[in-house]
Amino acid sequence: MTLLVGLVLILVGLIAWNICIWGYIIKWGYRRYKRHRLETEIERLNLILRERAEDSGNESNGEEEERLEQLIHNYNHNNHFANPMFDL
């Protein structure tokens, strides 16, 4: 009987450990996905702004620049780069 209780406790512990590991993996993957999505959006906006700057007849109203600054600020904050000298 004691052996059975011990085996059940070990099994419960292994299941709990497995849940913790999978939770960490899912959390890490989600953070990586968010960072990739943010980097892609920054690159896309930067490309749009460069193309618009090269095309002299097409001026922006500043919304993309503000959005790009906000995305870069969020990217730096999320990656623990908090240097006030580089604040936009």
Swiss-Prot record:
Pfam families reported for this sequence: Vpu (PF00558)
GO cellular component: host cell membrane; membrane
Localisation: Host membrane
GO aspect biological process, one term: receptor catabolic process
Residue numbers on the Cytoplasmic membrane side: 24-88
Keyword Transmembrane helix assigned: yes
Membrane topology term: Single-pass type I membrane protein
Transmembrane segments: 3-23
Comment text on domains: The N-terminus and transmembrane domains are required for self-oligomerization and proper virion budding, whereas the cytoplasmic domain is required for CD4 degradation. The cytoplasmic domain is composed of 2 amphipathic alpha helix that form a U-shape.
UniProt function note: Enhances virion budding, by targeting human CD4 and Tetherin/BST2 to proteasome degradation. Degradation of CD4 prevents any unwanted premature interactions between viral Env and its receptor human CD4 in the endoplasmic reticulum. Degradation of antiretroviral protein Tetherin/BST2 is important for virion budding, as BST2 tethers new viral particles to the host cell membrane. Mechanistically, Vpu bridges either CD4 or BST2 to BTRC, a substrate recognition subunit of the Skp1/Cullin/F-box protein E3 ubiquitin ligase, induces their ubiquitination and subsequent proteasomal degradation.
UniProt name for this protein: Protein Vpu
Organism of origin: Simian immunodeficiency virus (isolate CPZ GAB1) (SIV-cpz)
Gene behind this protein: vpu
